[in-house]
């Protein structure tokens, strides 16, 4: 019965899906007509005055630092005040693209959900962009941590380009209107992408204490998958934390994606090796690096035939019956005609194109039959002596180690070059990159408050504007109607099956009910009645025996305690009868 119900349900479900698919367009038209009617009724019932637009669920208020900061800008004043556009040219580049003439503007995001929230927007593509701003005061790397944080939104996605910031080193030569790619920086931090290579840079320039030369040190790549931050067109919060104990953390949206130590997790390492390979050392001419050599005592066997071919004709093969030896595999096309403009003087004698011989279609083959080629069992190839261990093997040669003349040990790489400005020096093939809410300070609490008042509001507004789970499922199904079938099979069908099995099962047999409830059944009652009869009969026999024993006892007392031989014989017989009555063999058979 359950199988029939299930089969019926599947048939009904399949019919409904087909009808829904066939009538999709008609349903859409009917729904649109109904909506038009409802809209007309509502418009007729509305007053003439236009209702004011609904206010956003999240109200924006420009963030304000809650403590001392080295730099903070939310751009909500609507101008580039405090920022300086570069007028420099990039060296070693064609004049057409050497200028830093990329456009910057302060504007809201194209799909802003927070009216009034503005940011710095990189407007142009395929151009060099450079803009910078002075800090309130230079940052000195002493006993306080450094925290850098800002927001990025790739509104159009990103093909190839960066959105990283540079913390420009404090030098007498620093001129922000000449900011370019060679301007000295202390730290570079932020996202960068080209092709399918998604990066989150953290680079600092370390000064060699012996030579005074600066060298870039790159943090290890994050283990997290960064692709979503570049492709989802949402605003993401990037945070760098450097501590005086040389530890660092990189966070995206307030979650750690990379961490480590400046001494252990940078490439190349901050401190060089104590020893290096001697550049003057040379490998001896007789140094043998061969682990295996040909056996010098091996001899080629006399029966080794190096000239035997790898393939030979199969001598056991026979020509298939019906093979057409006299028919060519291809013949001129009889329907082909010489083109009218064919010039035999210029083009030569015209020949019809070749086509497959139609006579060969019904035959196993045409033309000269040849035996197929097979592997030659006697083929051995060119003989080579076997390889043996080289008795003169000395291993792979390496130059000897010597003390590194350039060795130094800097145990406090956190004490970097002070910086006094922040800058964006970028090339991008995608426009409309949105930057917002830059902050540099030494207090994590201040940075978190700034993030909650800025990025936190964006996140809340995005969440309020996004549909719920059901809404997202409906939107996806509207774009891909086949998802309705998936929803039905994964949601409705299991629910129906649960109801079917729980509420419409078959009536159980009486025997099953008996096992569950211990209620007596007809055959069980009869069996119990038989048992009761046997029990009553046994009780009567026991009572009779007891009376007989009492009588015998009284007689024995009257006779002076003697027992006759007859009574002694009767007693074992009564015991035998009792045993036989209790034996299972004497019970009545159970009636089915």
UniProtKB/Swiss-Prot annotation:
Q: Which SUPFAM superfamilies match?
A: Concanavalin A-like lectins/glucanases, P-domain of calnexin/calreticulin
What is the annotated signal peptide range for this record? 1-20
- Bias category Basic and acidic residues: which stretches? 274-319
Q: Which PROSITE patterns match?
A: CALRETICULIN_1, CALRETICULIN_2, CALRETICULIN_REPEAT
Q: Which residues carry this modification: N6-acetyllysine?
A: 137
Q: Residue positions of the PTM Phosphoserine?
A: 554, 564, 583
List where the protein spans the membrane: 482-502
**Residue ranges of region Sufficient to mediate interaction with SGIP1?**
503-592
Q: Where is this region: Disordered?
A: 260-345, 511-592
Quaternary structure annotation from Swiss-Prot or TrEMBL: Interacts with MAPK3/ERK1. Interacts with KCNH2. Associates with ribosomes. Interacts with SGIP1; involved in negative regulation of endocytosis. The palmitoylated form interacts with the ribosome-translocon complex component SSR1, promoting efficient folding of glycoproteins. Interacts with SERPINA2P/SERPINA2 and with the S and Z variants of SERPINA1. Interacts with PPIB. Interacts with ZNRF4. Interacts with SMIM22. Interacts with TMX2. Interacts with TMEM35A/NACHO and CHRNA7. Interacts with reticulophagy regulators RETREG2 and RETREG3.
The family assignment reads: Belongs to the calreticulin family.
What exactly does this protein do?
Calcium-binding protein that interacts with newly synthesized monoglucosylated glycoproteins in the endoplasmic reticulum. It may act in assisting protein assembly and/or in the retention within the ER of unassembled protein subunits. It seems to play a major role in the quality control apparatus of the ER by the retention of incorrectly folded proteins. Associated with partial T-cell antigen receptor complexes that escape the ER of immature thymocytes, it may function as a signaling complex regulating thymocyte maturation.
State the name under which the record lists this protein.
Calnexin
């Amino acid at each position: 019965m359950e199988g029939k119900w299930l089969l019926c349900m599947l048939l009904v479900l399949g019919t409904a899906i087909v009808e829904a698919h066939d009538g999709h367009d008609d349903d859409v038209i009917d729904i649109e007509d109904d909506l038009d009617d409802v809209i007309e009724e509502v418009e007729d019932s509305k007053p003439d005055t236009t209702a004011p637009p609904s206010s956003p669920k999240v109200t924006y208020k420009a963030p304000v630092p809650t403590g001392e900061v080295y730099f903070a800008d939310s751009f909500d004043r609507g101008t580039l005040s405090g920022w300086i556009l570069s007028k420099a040219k990039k060296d070693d580049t064609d004049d057409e693209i050497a200028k830093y003439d990329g456009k910057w503007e302060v504007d809201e995001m194209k799909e802003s959900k927070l009216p009034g929230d503005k940011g710095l927007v990189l407007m142009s593509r395929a151009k060099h962009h450079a803009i910078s701003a002075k800090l309130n005061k230079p940052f000195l790397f002493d006993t306080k941590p450094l925290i850098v944080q800002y927001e990025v939104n790739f509104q159009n996605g990103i093909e190839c380009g960066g959105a990283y910031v540079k913390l420009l080193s404090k030098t007498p030569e620093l001129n922000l209107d000449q900011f370019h790619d060679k301007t000295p920086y202390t730290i570079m931090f932020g996202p960068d992408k080209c092709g399918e290579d998604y990066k989150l840079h953290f680079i600092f320039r370390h000064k060699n204490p012996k030579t005074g030369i600066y060298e870039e040190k790159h943090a290890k790549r994050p283990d997290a998958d960064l692709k979503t931050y570049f492709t989802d067109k949402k605003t993401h919060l990037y945070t760098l934390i450097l501590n005086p104990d040389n530890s660092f953390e990189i966070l995206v949206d307030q979650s750690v994606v990379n961490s480590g130590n400046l001494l252990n997790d940078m490439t190349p390492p901050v401190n060089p090796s104590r020893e290096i390979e001697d550049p003057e050392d040379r490998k001896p001419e007789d140094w043998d690096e061969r682990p295996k050599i040909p056996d010098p005592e091996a001899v080629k066997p006399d029966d080794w035939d190096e000239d035997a071919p790898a393939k030979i004709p199969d001598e056991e093969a026979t020509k298939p019956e019906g093979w057409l030896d006299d028919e060519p595999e291809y013949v001129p096309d009889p329907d082909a005609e010489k083109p009218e403009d064919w010039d035999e003087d210029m083009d030569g004698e015209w020949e019809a194109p070749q086509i497959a011989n139609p006579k060969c279609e019904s035959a196993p083959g045409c033309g000269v039959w040849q035996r197929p080629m097979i592997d030659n069992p006697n083929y051995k190839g060119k003989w080579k002596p076997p390889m043996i261990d080289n008795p003169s093997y000395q291993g792979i040669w390496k130059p000897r180690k010597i003390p590194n003349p350039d060795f130094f040990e800097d145990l406090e790489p956190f004490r970097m070059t002070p910086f006094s400005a922040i800058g964006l020096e970028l090339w991008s093939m995608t426009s409309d990159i949105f930057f917002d809410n830059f902050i540099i300070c030494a207090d994590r609490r201040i940075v978190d408050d700034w993030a909650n008042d800025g990025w936190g509001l964006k996140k809340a507004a995005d969440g309020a504007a996004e549909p719920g789970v059901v809404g997202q499922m409906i939107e996806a199904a509207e774009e891909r109607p086949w998802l309705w079938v998936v929803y039905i099979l994964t949601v409705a069908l299991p629910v129906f099956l649960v109801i079917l099995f729980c509420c419409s099962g078959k009536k159980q047999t009486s025997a099953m009910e008996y096992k569950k409830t211990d209620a007596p059944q007809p055959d069980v009652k009869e069996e119990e009645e038989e048992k009761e009869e046997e029990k009553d009969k046994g009780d009567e026999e026991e009572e009779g025996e007891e009376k007989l024993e009492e009588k015998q006892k009284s007689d024995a007392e009257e006779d002076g305690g003697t027992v006759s031989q007859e009574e002694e014989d009767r007693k074992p017989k009564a015991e035998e009868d009792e045993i036989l009555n209790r034996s299972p063999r004497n019970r009545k058979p159970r009636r089915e």
